[in-house]
Amino acid sequence: MQDKYNHLDVERSAQTHWNAADAYRVTEDASRKKYYACSMLPYPSGKLHMGHVRNYTINDMLSRYLRMKGYNVLMPMGWDAFGLPAENAALKNGVPPAQWTYDNIAYMKKQMQAMGLAVDWSREIATCDPSYYKWNQWLFLKMLEKGIAYRKTQVVNWDPVDQTVLANEQVIDGKGWRTGATVEKREIPGYYLKITDYAEELLGSVQHKLPGWPERVKLMQENWIGKSEGVRFAFLHDIKDASGALIGDGQMYVFTTRADTIMGVTFCAVAPEHPLAVHAAASNPALAAFVEECKSGGTTEAELATQEKKGQPTGLFVTHPLTGDKVEVWVGNYVLMSYGDGAVMGVPAHDERDFEFAKKYGLPIKQVTDVKGQAYSLDAWADWYGDKQHGIAINSGKYDGLAFKAAVDAIAADLAALGLGEKKTTWRLRDWGVSRQRYWGTPIPIIHCDEHGAVPVPEKDLPVVLPMDCIPDGSGNPLHKHEGFHAGVVCPVCGKPARRETDTMDTFVDSSWYFMRYCDPKNSEAMVAGGADYWMPMDQYIGGIEHAILHLLYARFWTKVMRDLGLVKVDEPFTKLLTQGMVLNHIYSRRTDKGGKEYFWPHDVEHVLDDTGKIAGARLKNAVGDLPVGTAIDYEGVGTMSKSKNNGVDPQDIIEKYGADTARLYTMFTAPPEATLEWNDAGVEGSYRFLRRVWNFGVKLNAMNSGANGADAACAKGLFDKETKALRLEVHTLLKQVDYDYQRMQYNTVVSGGMKLLNALEDFKGEISAASLAALREGFSVLLRCLYPAAPHLTHALWSELGYAAEAGDLLDTPWPEVDASALQQDEIELMLQINGKLRGSVTVPAGADKAVIEAAALASEAFVKQAAGAPAKKVIVVPGRLVNIVV
């Protein structure tokens, strides 16, 4: 056994052993309890970052612990391999996205293996492999058959540089998230999935079927689905288009959740794309210019809520359905055509957005709800405008005096009687547009025929294989001009020459079901089969909070579609969800002469502290470029590790210098899994020192071990002296706590428990005998098993070197240690001793002592005799198991 801990040798040896044993390959076994634990599959960007290390270590600790607990554990890994970054890399480096992607996969896989992850690599998938995306295409065709997938033309966000559609979430301040180009509104055809058909179930399941999910994530999904109950009704008009036909059949529909305020309408606003806006703009240059301006504005509800409210009158009027009053129509930049009917009623007295708009343009404000008798006031308005729980209708004619619900019911009934409205439930959720004008994605299995239009590719011809030799040049989708992609393509209906669909699928499609493919990854005959019946639903899913809405919602929807098609039996894919915290580091920068920012690596910087020891600034401790040592720079606090801010830490550097076990241990010990982790180099050093202490104690114990390998046989009650019993009490007390912390996935306290356990072993001062050596060996075996999920390489080596493997087998499959109840039984207990309520010492009594024995021991104690100074005890209060208080 080596005297000094050499992490390189230890980790290389352990990984060689595991690989030779094919240690992590798992098969379905109906006789065993299963547990499926999975981290969200990574995008193969090139290198792992510390966020990856933290995520995968959380999963690995859970998997190893449960395997020791007897579970049949599946921990798979794969690659979310399609996406725009590969195309951007191709543009930059002149290599096909496929080559860039597979090179990155190979490198990142080596990094993961160096971490010692218990991954079953036989189940590895890459979403860019035709054997995987074939099933994207197959299910898409099934959705077409069932009417879940459909084609339509819709106004979309168009990035003119990337030549692609952007989701609302990818438009930031009117610009493309990647290119920064001003986003345009365009009408183009594309394929959509009817996720809205599942809105009610998706919402209901969030509320009732996901108890193992964080409340924060569930609330985010509820808000995204956005169920609203209200009234949809029409304003009448006689506005005609150029052909003389009434626009919208003479009706302009709106939806409101506040029908009780309908009598307070003083204007209406429509989206720039609304037919009335388009009609009015045709003869109004100022309005036409405003409509064009709106195209570069925000496209999400969040952006519209914060941007300045702007409008332009159309010169058109509609008729109020209940009063007959004429209501002016405006175009508003805060109205979305994609939500509701693209028009809203303006009730500035009782809606914050309408109020802001009306104040800006001097529009009338009419109060129609009285709240707690308060007089209407522009100053006090914001405090009560939305109080619908206590409002009473006023200035509303026949509805005066009605409370909110009664007013809504009465108004809805009157609108229905007129044939102009009805109660309705609406949803914020919109159908999922899956068409992308990009190359590196799953080809949509459609053939376009001049005679028969869009025709599905026959199942026998799947997969439609993506050409692997394309190198995007920035001029749009290269599939348009790739001759091989279209060569020999004929219409499945008539057999005439045709062309393939060149749009590819949104990459969220790839990640919406990959976790099911892990269950049966090599099956060429079925998308999923018996493996999914065994492993699904997933027991624990681990990933970042940034995926709370889109990925998790789409995965839930995809699962329900697969269930309805008879492919799986589960309603929800993920039983429990853990969203791990981000890894943060210090950020240092300075303004450049050109007004930009230059960021500095933390290893080049030292802090400047104020009188209280707080960070007041920073300066260079190493020369950087032309900047000398001592140059003052700005300290921006801590933030997420980022390449752009030079505050990332390369896991490879940590693994090479300290070892994978140190990287794993540090990321687990520093903060609970759900909390953010602030990087600290000193903490990494501390984790390494702890592992070195564990190794050193193993060396010491190995030297003490003179053939006393029968630890379990020697550990029998009655063979131990007082010090040894105290050691065993501490060992099994800590084991009980660590086991509980593993069950709660509180891995920071798991590691701290291991540290306390090592302290107890190191601090043992008893006489070394066969019995005490057996107790030390028992304690160290408990420590190794407790630390094994966090530091598998070191514990594997020590387990073997100290002879535990010869007794109990490979640590990988050694059962979790059992708490010895007899070790927790104490012969004596120590009670706090108080005199007149103040702590003065302690008293030791037999564990089963009654009150009389405890009182006698307390009164005879040295502490009482000294403090009482001869004064008699007036009263003795005993709190069993805790303290004795003597009143004198």
Curated annotation (Swiss-Prot):
Pfam family, one: tRNA-synt_1_2
Residues spanned by motif 'HIGH' region: 42-52
Keyword Ligase: yes
Enzyme Commission number: 6.1.1.4
Segment forming the signal sequence: none
Motif 'KMSKS' region, residue range(s) on this chain: 640-644
GO-annotated molecular function: aminoacyl-tRNA deacylase activity; ATP binding; leucine-tRNA ligase activity
Protein localization: Cytoplasm
One Gene Ontology CC term in the entry: cytosol
Binding residues annotated for ATP, in chain numbering: 643
Chief location: cytoplasm
Coiled coil: none
EC category: ligase
Catalysed reaction equations from the record: tRNA(Leu) + L-leucine + ATP = L-leucyl-tRNA(Leu) + AMP + diphosphate
Keyword check for Ligase: yes
InterPro entries: aa-tRNA-synth_I_CS, aa-tRNA-synth_Ia, Leu-tRNA-ligase, Leu_tRNA-synth_edit, M/V/L/I-tRNA-synth_anticd-bd, Methionyl/Leucyl_tRNA_Synth, Rossmann-like_a/b/a_fold, tRNAsynth_Ia_anticodon-bd
Name of the protein described by the UniProt record: Leucine--tRNA ligase
